[in-house]
Structures are given as C-alpha cells and as structure tokens.
Amino acid sequence: MSEKIWISVCEYQDLLPDTGLCALVNKQQVALFNSRRLNEVFAVSNFDPIGEANVLSRGILGSIGDEIVVASPLYKQHFNLRTGECLEKPEYNIAVYPVRVEDGLVQVLV
C-alpha cells in the first residue's frame, strides 16, 4: 500500500468563500469548499452518485441543523461535507478527503 501525501491543489485566495472549486488530484476530481461561516475548508469527491455526474463543486454550500452540506445541482440532495453521507438517502455517500491550508496553499491528503 502506498503512503499518503499532501498535494497542493490551489492557493487559498483562489478558493472563494461559500463557493466550490474542482481540482484534479491523483486522477480524481475533488470538490473544494471554503465555508465563510465556519472558516474551514472541505474536500470531497466531485462525483454525485445519485445523478451519476461530476458536479458537486457546482452545488450550493449550506447547513441543515448543525450539519455543513453541499446540495447537488442536479437533484438537490444534500451531502454532509464532514462524513460524506447523503441526508435524504443515507445509502449513498461521497468520499471525504483530509484538507489543510499551509503557507497559503490548499492541500489534500491522498
């Protein structure tokens, strides 16, 4: 098994608050979100398993109760950005990646 490494994907200033950005990381599309309210960056798979398309980076960032979510632009289902679970259909989930900001760069652990 290969060791995981932190990969720089963009500058933090390129990740606008409350919007998504898609990056290709090790041949995987990763959706990045910068929550202004939480002052936190999230990284999840860009693939919507219900709509079967790489679109989550175009989704709407928000919250339901205490959960930070992204609403898919296709069928509007909500995915928890911390756990990857779909709130409406828990049998579906998306990959969640560790993410950090180091020296002004957004990095994903893959």
Segment roles from a protein language model:
Residues K76-P98:
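C-terminal structural segments of small proteins and small subunits
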Residues M1-E67, N93-V110:
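N-terminal pre-ligand scaffold of iron-sulfur
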Residues D48, S72-Y75:
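Short cysteine clusters
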